[in-house]
Every structure is written in structure tokens, then in C-alpha cells.
């Protein structure tokens, strides 16, 4: 009985420590607003989003050539 309790305790400790070593924490990316996400993302994202209390660290996608107005293009024909 003591050995099985000891074995379960060892497995519990190993599972917790392995997730800490690998940097996996399921509660760190929880957020209330974009300020919490700015701390969690650790990269420069102008205003990361907090969607369903989970941080979205992806930067906004750049506009494609079709989305850029013709007046904003710098190409000129001579």
C-alpha cells in the first residue's frame, strides 16, 4: 500500500515538473483585456486580442496588393 501511494506521488511530481520544464502552463495565456496579452505575448504586437479569455498573439496580416488603393501605390509610368 505504501509503495503504490509513493509511486502515485512520484508520478504526480514528475508530471507537474515536466510541464514546468517545458514551459507549458495552461493558465498563463488567460486574459481579461489586451494589456494582459501584451505581457503574455512577449513580442511586439500593437494590440494583441483577448478572445474568449485566451490571448491571440498573432500580428495583423499585411494587406495584399488587391486591398491597397491605386493612389497609394508608388509605381509611376513615364
UniProtKB/Swiss-Prot annotation:
Organism from which the protein derives: Arabidopsis thaliana (Mouse-ear cress)
Subcellular location: Secreted
Record's keyword annotation contains Ribosomal protein: no
GO CC field: extracellular region
Coiled-coil segments on the chain, per record: none
Transport is among the record's keywords: no
Lineage: Eukaryota, Viridiplantae, Streptophyta, Embryophyta, Tracheophyta
Signal peptide: 1-19
Family statement: Belongs to the DEFL family.
Superkingdom: Eukaryota
Name of the molecule in the record: Defensin-like protein 308
GO biological process: defense response to fungus; killing of cells of another organism
Keywords: Antimicrobial, Disulfide bond, Fungicide, Plant defense, Secreted, Signal
Disulfide bond entries: 31-50, 37-55, 41-57
Amino acid at each position: 500500500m505504501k509503495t503504490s501511494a509513493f509511486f502515485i506521488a512520484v508520478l504526480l511530481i514528475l508530471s507537474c515538473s515536466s510541464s514546468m520544464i517545458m514551459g507549458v502552463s495552461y493558465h498563463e495565456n488567460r486574459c481579461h483585456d489586451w494589456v494582459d496579452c501584451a505581457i503574455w505575448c512577449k513580442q511586439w504586437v500593437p494590440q494583441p486580442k483577448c478572445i474568449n479569455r485566451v490571448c491571440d498573439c498573432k500580428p495583423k496580416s499585411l494587406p495584399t496588393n488587391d486591398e491597397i488603393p491605386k493612389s497609394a501605390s508608388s509605381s509611376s509610368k513615364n
